[in-house]
Amino acid sequence: LKEYADIVQTNSNLLLQLISDVLDISRLESGKLQFNYEWCELVNHCQNMITLTNRNKTVDVDIKLQMPKEPYMLYTDPLRLQQIIINLLNNALKFTPAGGSITLDYEVDEEKQCMLFSVTDTGTGIPEDKQELVFQRFEKLNEFVQGTGLGLAICKLTIQYMGGDIWIDKSYKNGARFIFSHPIKKQESTEK
């Protein structure tokens, strides 16, 4: 009986996630998704995301923030940034076997005036012919892995709405590396 209850619970959670994902895409496309920008300290914010992901993992995978990092204030929507990064971390977790690692990193690209975030794993990787498909709705690389196939589409739309872009690092061959850009703004420029 417990086994059936667990199956019902799992399927209920998947259905709720699917509904939530479809609503997010609908809000993004109609311009009705709310963005609340504020100054956010990245080291603590990223470390909190790592802690959250570590708490929910079911496989022994090392998830870490690339260190050392200097404190950095980014003008962003902290909730949307968290949604993007946790989605990327959770995807990496799905495809990284026990004993593997996942690294969250970020660096300023002064020339392009953006922050570059990356999530790198030592998982199964993504075949080259599938790399552009992963950002399409309902696209799943593996039908046996849980998920709606909407997470990366939501990430891409959200990142584009915030003025950035997302892509797969084709040069990385030891798993998968997703990189996304986020515009930066100087703190002084917003003070009056």
Please provide the spans of the model-predicted regions.
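Short conserved segments within the C-terminal catalytic ATPase subdomain
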Residues: N56-L65
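Short alpha-helical Gxxx[C/S/T] motif in the catalytic ATP-binding
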Residues: G151, C155
